[in-house]
């Protein structure tokens, strides 16, 4: 990884170097994996990757908020959001890597 952000291209390159598949095959593998995760979330399923974490779609209720420009009350519609909770293994790994 070159910068502070891991990209799809970085993932593809890492898979290519580790597994030895062609770059094109690695790109397809990474894309298919991400598609499977997205499809599961679209269906409202929870995606659990052991040792990594859990992606989950949650429903948020409608609520009253404020228009930041006018300060007037405004209703915020109900919506769905994606949450991620890192596993204990991942949290410990990050703590070790970042000196925490």
Swiss-Prot record:
Concerning InterPro entries, the annotation shows: Hist_DNA-bd, Histone-like_DNA-bd_CS, IHF-like_DNA-bd_dom_sf, IHF_alpha
Protein's GO biological process:
DNA recombination; positive regulation of metabolic process; regulation of DNA-templated transcription; regulation of translation
Q: Where are the transmembrane segments?
A: none
Cited SMART domains: BHL (SM00411)
Give the Gene Ontology MF terms in alphabetical order. DNA binding; structural constituent of chromatin
Q: Which GO terms describe its cellular component?
A: cytosol
- Gene3D superfamilies listed in its UniProt record: IHF-like DNA-binding proteins
Give the residue range of the signal peptide.
none
Keywords (alphabetical) are: DNA recombination, DNA-binding, Transcription, Transcription regulation, Translation regulation
Q: Which SUPFAM superfamilies match?
A: IHF-like DNA-binding proteins
Record has DNA damage as a keyword: no
Job description of the protein? This protein is one of the two subunits of integration host factor, a specific DNA-binding protein that functions in genetic recombination as well as in transcriptional and translational control.
As for family, the record states:
Belongs to the bacterial histone-like protein family.
How the protein assembles, per its UniProt entry? Heterodimer of an alpha and a beta chain.
Name this protein carries in UniProt: Integration host factor subunit alpha
The organism named in the record is: Caulobacter vibrioides (strain NA1000 / CB15N)
